[in-house]
Amino acid sequence: SFLIFSCSENKVSIDIPTLSKYNIISDYSDVADTLNVYLNKSVGISLEISDKQKKRSIILVEKTDLNKDFISIDYKDSLITISANNKRNLYYATYDFIEKFLNVNWLSNDFTYYEDLKSINFPKNYSYYFEPPVLTRTVHSKLFYKDSVFADKLKVTNEAFPRYVPSARVHTFHRFLPYEVFYDKNPEYYALRNGKRLPTQLCLTNTDVLKIVKDSVNSFFNKFPNSDVISVSQDDNTQYCQCDKCSKIDNQEGSPAGTMIHFVNAVAESFPNKTISTLAYQYTRKPPKVKPIENVLITLCSIECNRSVPIELGCKDFSSDLKGWSQLTDNIRIWDYTTQFTNFLAPFPNWGTIKPNINLFVDNNAKWIFEQHSNNDSELFELRSYIMAKLLWNPNLDFQTLLNEFNNKYYGNGGKYISEYVNSIQNQIDNTSFFLFLYGDPSQGFDSFLSPENLLNYDILFNKALSSVELDSEYYKRILRSKISIDYAVLESYRKNFSDLYQLTKTENDIKSINPKLIRRLNAFSKTCNDNDITLMNEMGFTVSDYIVNYRKALKTAIKENLASFKDVTLLTVPKKYANEDPKVLTDGALGGNSFYSNWLGFEGNNLNAVVDLGELKEIKSLSMNFLQVTNHIVFFPVQVEFFYSDDNLKWKSLGKVSNKSDLSPKSKVNDIQTFSINAGELKARYIKVIADNMSKAPIWHHGADLPSWIFADELIIE
């Protein structure tokens, strides 16, 4: 056994017989055992763990004299030294060594890539030292939350809010002063809006509120003594207090963050050995003049930003706010967003923003970054989790290298096609001015990056990937699972029914039926989700099962002989914002999905009042219309829907009223679709009127209390 020097004499190659004579020196046997596990799997050896250094040793050492996070790997004179400032980072350093020199890659928590090595190779007199610029790194992914060892391998946290009080992590005002307990007796504790106290936010200049919050924070810390961070933060709405005292401070500070920071500073002063976290989010995002005190953690959120371009280019107001906060404090936690919360499984081409955004945060001294991904399965879930974790650890890594490395190892020969898909869809959105929204819908991209022609191209790439690997191999199964995002986008394209490539129905011999290609796609989507335990469509709890059931119902509707199809619609009330405010949406044959962007006509604070002209007298037996509910976005079912008929569009007769079957409450299903239908018996009419009664305002218990509520309607069916 001997050391083999390369011809250039710049590298040292240690063969397996030589390596087997090494021992491992470490105060931590578990870290040494971990190294042995991967030595055994990569080169087939396990080394003696000892406290005696030999001529050839691997030394795992903790160096506590340096008061900062670091890892280092050194090779000199046949000694391999792996060191870090604490045990956690020593694990990270060991994993770094395993990855760099044993060519191991942890790609998901159920797949590790190995190579069959004959030796390990070092640059001569190798010395590597690295200080991670981000000290707390979190990717919101169940891959890490359910497997703490896998999280350690990728050097991220295994929980979303490390060190936080478990029940007080974000949007906590309502936890400190519950509406049910305080509002009736003390409405002055809450936000004044248009002369009315609403339980949407707290009045931050009320001294009793400050005392109650301090007492609550103290109780939480007593209950959870091992936690050292608690969130004292606004609830998830923009209805902050505008009383004279609060408004005066906000005006002086130049931002509603003024009252927030004054309030949170006052809380933090009472807990000098704890960290009080608060949000710079929506209305509090703009920094005030007052500085947060030392133990206040600012969680700065980028929720408004366009996800198709880097924040520094496409969201300059956020970039400016980030720089403003970084001048006030070094204690910044970034809360960034990397998925479409309304459609987890949809293609979401934010690939070109991941690295630039992390670099922006790091350049502005963010030491804590939380990348809020989907947690649950979403488009190319494993790939995204991997790339974000890698870049949080080392923002200087090359995105394309990471992309290709992962895909080639995780998908085998199919990997190059997955990389081509990622680059292709990113190029498509780069060539448009498309605003990629966190709460958007695939249908918004049907005239750009998700056009029928582009969908066909993506489909071809995934099919090439499938064809390039062995049928039913693990590679094949992974590619098939990853294809569901294209399957989902294609299904939504069929639903929209706007392209010859993806037609919803076909007609033969005057008989309308569903396109058989659609049926095959729907069945494949359902099977892939079922086989891989993919259960959620969005953050509102809308399940894959809900989606399949509603889609099949929509297909039954699509083949009905609808007398209203493509008939003229006159609106007697004014819609707002969605579906281009086009009344034809109600009769266009395209069926609304689970998102309000998906072919729904919206009315904010007012009723739907629509008249359909059938062109001539028609025999009518039944009428129905669908309505959408998304409670967290103040979208509710109508209180009731009334159907009318007329021969002349002047004199109207009511067919009856249909009440909402699912009364709104805090326990209502967040995302749902309800059909309001009525039997007409047998009558003849030319004109049909539908009036859907809006609740007008969100109820007092809702986070949007007193704001105008929405109703969303689609597809009047007249049989």
Regions found by a protein language model. Give the residues of each.
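Structured mid-domain segments that build the active-site/substrate or prosthetic-cofactor binding neighborhood
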Residues: 208-209, 219, 317-416, 420
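Acidic, His- and aromatic-enriched active-site or binding-groove loops in soluble protein domains
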Residues: 250-267, 294-312, 392-398
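Catalytic domains of carbohydrate-active enzymes that cleave complex glycans
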Residues: 50-52, 392-579, 583
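Substrate-binding cleft/loops of secretory-pathway carbohydrate-active enzymes
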Residues: 277-304, 345-352, 378-385
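Short, well-ordered secondary-structure micro-motifs within conserved domains or adaptor modules
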Residues: 39, 45-71, 82
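Feature activates predominantly on carbohydrate-active enzymes
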Residues: 14-17, 26, 30-34, 38, ...
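Aromatic, loop-rich ligand-recognition surfaces of beta-strand-rich domains
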Residues: 592-656, 672-719
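Bacterial Sec-dependent signal peptides at the C-terminal "C-region" and cleavage site
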Residues: 2-15
